[in-house]
Amino acid sequence: MLGWIKCLMRMWFQRVGVSMQSVLWSGKPYGSSRSIVRKIGTNLSLIQCPRVQFQLTSHATEWSPTHPGEDVVATFADVGWVATDEGECSTRLRTEVRSKPPLENNPPCFEKPPSRHISLPNSSQDKPSPKTTLASEEALQKISALENELAALRAQIAKIVTLQEQQSPSAGCLDSSTPVIVVPPPPPPPPPPPPLPPPPLVLHPSTSALDLIKERREQRLSAGKTLAKGHPKKLDMPNMLEILKDMNSVKLRPVKRSEKDEKPRPVDITDPAALIAEALKKKFAYRHRHNSQGEAERGIPKPESDATSEPALFGPHTLKSTGKMKALIENVSDS
């Protein structure tokens, strides 16, 4: 494969006129033999591409319908010239556009040649033409005539205004001779009635503290509402001294207890709260041992309920002894 590529390259270089040795082994960094591409370019005769050429022409040599074949070369005037006579928006050369035939009814009009963007200064545009000076004088005359008409209109408006001002006081005098009936204003509404005084507080022997607190709270709320209507103010915080002021005069009713309430209730075996309380008492009995010894030394009698209490069905006595509780009690007593 490599040999075939070498043979192909030798054939190509022989056809061009370049030796293989000079291409591969010549390492000159200058001249036309610096690279293979430069060598091929110097030996091959390449045809240059055609370039665009622009030519400036005068008005006399522009295209005309009588001489369609002349001035075929594109110029700078043709670059931005757009044909708008047929409603088209595409850019074309002036040589490709044909003028429309003139109508019979309309008189021939001289069209303005297409405008060109010329960067060279034009001496003809610097001098003002006599036609433009005449047009400016006519415009000034028209403006002065309009100003005179405006001044006359202003004078007429001022006369009309003065006549209206003179007629208005005379009409006012005529109106003043007629009697004018004045309607009296409506009387103001009567003031609101004052709030009723609070009822006197009567203490009954059967009233309780809750009733007194409720009454005082209602009185305070009613007084606060009246104050908010007249003078909106913030309500003060309730004072316990005012609430408990008449507590000494309150008499409590004696309540008779039934025999069932006096007797101690028997402990329910199925009550979980009682079982848990009894278990906790048994568990933490060693903590109150020192207190019980002190009470025995002082001679404080034990309550009969403890002595006559029945043994609990649930507690640490139902568990098997492991010896850990005794060790704990001994450690606590030693400490």
From Swiss-Prot:
Listed GO CC annotations: mitochondrion; plasma membrane
Region named Necessary and sufficient to promote mitochondrial fission: 178-306
Composition bias, Polar residues: 120-135, 168-178
Modified residues (Phosphoserine): 119, 129
Role: May play a role in mitochondrial aerobic respiration. May also regulate mitochondrial organization and fission.
Protein name (database record): Mitochondrial fission regulator 1
One Pfam family recorded for the sequence: Mito_fiss_reg
Coiled coil: 131-167
InterPro entries: Mtfr1 (IPR007972)
Transit peptide interval: 1-48
Region (Disordered), start-end ranges: 94-135, 168-201, 286-335
Residue ranges, compositional bias (Pro residues): 182-201
Gene name per UniProt: Mtfr1
